[in-house]
Amino acid sequence: MEEMEDTETEPQVYMACIQHGRRVGVSYYDCSVRQLHVLEFWEEDCSDFTLINMVKYQAKPSIIYASTKSEESFVAALQQNDGTDETTMVKLVKSSTFSYEQAWHRLVYLRVTGMDDGLNIKERICYLSSMMDVGSEVQVRVSGGLLAILESERIVETLEQNESGSASIAIDSVMEVPLNKFLKLDAAAHEALQIFQTDKHPSHMGIGRAKEGFSVFGMMNKCATPMGRRLLRSWFMRPILDLEVLDRRLNAISFFISSVELMASLRETLKSVKDISHLLKKFNSPTSLCTSNDWTAFLKSISALLHVNKIFEVGVSESLREHMRRFNLDIIEKAGLCISTELDYVYELVIGVIDVTRSKERGYQTLVKEGFCAELDELRQIYEELPEFLQEVSAMELEHFPHLHKEKLPPCIVYIQQIGYLMCIFGEKLDETALNRLTEFEFAFSDMDGETQRFFYHTSKTRELDNLLGDIYHKILDMERAIIRDLLSHTLLFSAHLLKAVNFVAELDCILSLACVAHQNNYVRPVLTVESLLDIRNGRHVLQEMAVDTFIPNDTEINDNGRIHIITGPNYSGKSIYVKQVALIVFLSHIGSFVPADAATVGLTDRIFCAMGSKFMTAEQSTFMIDLHQVGMMLRQATSRSLCLLDEFGKGTLTEDGIGLLGGTISHFATCAEPPRVVVCTHLTELLNESCLPVSEKIKFYTMSVLRPDTESANMEEIVFLYRLIPGQTLLSYGLHCALLAGVPEEVVKRAAIVLDAFESNNNVDKLSLDKISSQDQAFKDAVDKFAELDISKGDIHAFFQDIFTS
């Protein structure tokens, strides 16, 4: 049985943005799921519009629409590249597009899947208010304006004329996105923590799609369905702060980890669920033609959805049900509500009309099941028996025209779609004499079949067949298409039920994916709290532990008795990995995932800031400037619930400037009444001087432990990095040892040790005493001695130079 190709197309996202003072309204439409998103927020600093950049990064629009009356700084922020390879086109439209009256009119007549057709205007407004804030002028203007643009650009489908005389726009859902309910991370944080990583297709011609590389999302994504992968990506893009939702996800993961067989059975079933949202969009489009592959995928998907419900109904033992009740899970009830009996009806409806194997068996395009329509069956039987019938008619015709008979290829009557029935004569065209005898023959056209030329004629018999049978193939197609259109219209009546089931399965797929990863990698359930603290026991880095044979875990404890952690230590000692693992454990906790640790208590975090030296390939700023920008946002926007990470901040400029900038940043946080949680990694050991940093109980110092049996030993190979975080400070970087580990030649490292020792003892650096250099010096001395002995007035200058340069 053929299946629809399971490919995920890049989503087309169209966005509109308007500014009203400091209040910004954003709406964007995702064509892949026919979903309209709307949000508004307050920009504290209208000079850089940081929240707009964050929304752009998350939505990844292909086009942004704005009013022609927008401020230049606002348009510049929309045009700004967020550092990724994708470039966004900003298109200015007339300001009246976003007028409140026109926008309100568009929203009132918006058709959302599941909305009753008989609702009046007041009831429509009530229905919409459950999905967005219709009382917000900014939200109404931006979403209504975007709908007008989508209609004018023919991006969305429009339905019949409504009572006002204009067409209604049809979409699947409207969703308000409140930013204050999410953990915020910008593109720099995603890059630094390697949450997403896109590997471009290696083709130089640009053929082929990019794929997810070695990233946190790539490792956690074990989803079996396209809808699950999309939803999980949105979870990673927008981690949440809702404790109730997070606990519900964690409870579900705990349950599935305790019932591995059930998890495996569900995941195997979900592999048969294709992209139903995409199929419904195709069914709803008047220009799309549904193939047998589409119907195969649709039927297999519904069958799999029904099987998921059956697994929950009969495949869950009483002990597992008791386990569910202990976790306060309502998965069985939710499955029964979402995967309703209407899906059974849709399956029986489609299977009663469509035969997905018929096209392959019959050799032509036909989908309607045999026995469904007697008239159609009769036409198809005639069409399938047409070659034998025409062969008989041809033989009878040749009896009337014996002089047309040829030995190799006798004339025959053929059927050509959209043209009709014709007499085909091979090799030579009938001459005038023959046509005078055959008065009923009328030349139509000629063509080549390989090396044989064919000539086609209308005859009285072919005209009779035209009148009797007509263009039978297209009669069949027209009749089948009418039947399938009727089937589609009935199927689409259940779109809301199908989408409800799809949304349930997508969420289930995400939970199963996270549970699978947690079970495979021995993750634990984090404890989430409203208190602003962080307590991790034996935390690990999500990706690093996959890449090494042995990973050394570390503890983290950030509370009111030390919210600023300054970590010093050698290169290669694991400081950066530690900082990132802390952030990733916090990040995964806000997705509702288990985390790589023995235990973790995580306070809700509103934002993760990263100044970690990450640089986008397309960024127009230096790494140091990017870090300065990140630190500037930390100082302005960080709250007591934020997590700020600084890795080697200050190294991109003069040492004195770097010390001053880092010291000033830490001092600012230390003097805050309620500072954020701050983790700093640095080699600027001058900061350890009391003149650089204030004495504060909020600051704690840590270092990465190093084992060196004899501190006086000159053998650098005896140093062992333990990758263990311990309280304390260190002034040593062990840079020479790191150079050896990195493969720097040993003679270079030894010379570096001599230079370093001379520098520390304030002595002159001894000149290199290599054999090659010594022989060169001796040759130069000999040349000088010979020149001193030469009597220029009497000597042979030519012989002198020849002697020097040959020697």
From Swiss-Prot:
Expression sites by tissue: Specifically expressed in flowers.
Entry's Gene Ontology cellular component terms:
condensed nuclear chromosome; cytosol; germ cell nucleus
Keywords in UniProt for this one? ATP-binding, Chromosome, DNA-binding, Meiosis, Nucleotide-binding, Nucleus
| Description of the deletion phenotype | Normal vegetative growth but severe reduction in fertility due to a decrease in chiasma frequency at metaphase I of meiosis.
- Annotated GO MF terms: ATP binding; ATP-dependent DNA damage sensor activity; mismatched DNA binding
Which InterPro entries does this chain map to?
A: DNA_mismatch_repair_Msh2, DNA_mismatch_repair_MutS_C, DNA_mismatch_repair_MutS_core, DNA_mismatch_repair_MutS_sf, MutS, P-loop_NTPase
Entry keyword Nucleus: yes
GO BP annotation list: chiasma assembly; homologous chromosome segregation; meiotic mismatch repair involved in reciprocal meiotic recombination; reciprocal meiotic recombination
Q: Where does ATP bind?
A: 569-576
Superkingdom of the organism of origin: Eukaryota
Task: Please state where this protein is localized.
Answer: Nucleus; Chromosome
Q: Briefly, what is this protein's role?
A: Involved in meiotic recombination in association with MSH4. Required for reciprocal recombination and proper segregation of homologous chromosomes at meiosis. Promotes homologous recombination through facilitating chiasma formation during prophase I. Involved in the control of class I crossovers formation.
> What family does the entry list?
Belongs to the DNA mismatch repair MutS family.
Please identify the protein, giving its name as recorded: DNA mismatch repair protein MSH5
Task: Look up and give the organism this protein is from.
Answer: Arabidopsis thaliana (Mouse-ear cress)
